[in-house]
């Protein structure tokens, strides 16, 4: 039996309105059932979790999310040090599952409460609710930050310190879109720029030096 490619966090959003829609339809209340059926179908799309053919690229840093690159900027990260940040905006139509950009040991996570500004706004990086995942690879450190937005109000990180992740492996999701930032060491040969579309676990953001 083929497993439906749906993130497990999505099932409550699919099953609950689906049951209500079915019950109303059986009662002959089709007009009332329609919005619940639409919500269930929309959630099927929102929480889809397709399999990905992860490329084997020596030194490659894979995109941790599907979406559009907002910016590529030099900055500082408390775990990585001097870094380049690739900010990726996820719309509600994108796949919301996050994947590890490198094969690594989870060195730590840090969660910060915050606001729910539009994720594409520059101040969302520091002001919004977020969860940072610090990854220790064989030769480099990388940080991935999940950032909530206007629609996304729930960050899910399934891993913790000491866990091991393969490159492209799922580690969490942001419900209903938002933003994911990837911090790589300065000197990384970044291969994307603002405006590019990227695919989580497949697009190579850059090559570690």
Description of each model-found segment:
Residues 1-209:
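Contiguous, well-folded functional domains in the mature portion of proteins
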């Amino acid at each position: 039996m083929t497993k439906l490619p749906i993130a497990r966090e999505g099932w409550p959003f699919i099953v609950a309105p689906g049951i209500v829609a079915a019950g109303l339809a059986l009662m002959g209340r089709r007009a009332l059932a329609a919005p619940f059926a639409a919500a269930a179908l929309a959630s099927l799309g929102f929480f889809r979790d397709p399999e990905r053919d992860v490329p084997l690229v020596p030194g490659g840093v894979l995109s941790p999310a599907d979406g559009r690159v907002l910016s590529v900027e030099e900055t500082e990260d408390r775990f990585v040090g001097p870094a380049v940040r690739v900010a990726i905006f996820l719309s509600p139509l994108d796949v919301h599952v996050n994947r590890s950009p490198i094969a690594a040991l989870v060195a730590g996570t840090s969660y910060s409460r915050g606001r729910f500004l539009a994720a594409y706004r520059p101040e969302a990086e520091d002001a919004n609710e977020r969860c940072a995942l610090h990854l220790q690879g064989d030769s480099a450190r990388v940080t991935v930050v999940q950032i909530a937005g206007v629609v996304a109000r729930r960050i899910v990180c399934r891993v913790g310190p000491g866990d091991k992740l393969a490159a492209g492996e799922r580690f969490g999701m942001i419900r209903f879109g938002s933003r994911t930032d990837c911090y790589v060491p300065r000197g990384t040969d970044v291969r994307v720029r603002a405006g590019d579309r990227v695919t989580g676990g497949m697009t190579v953001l850059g090559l570690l030096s």
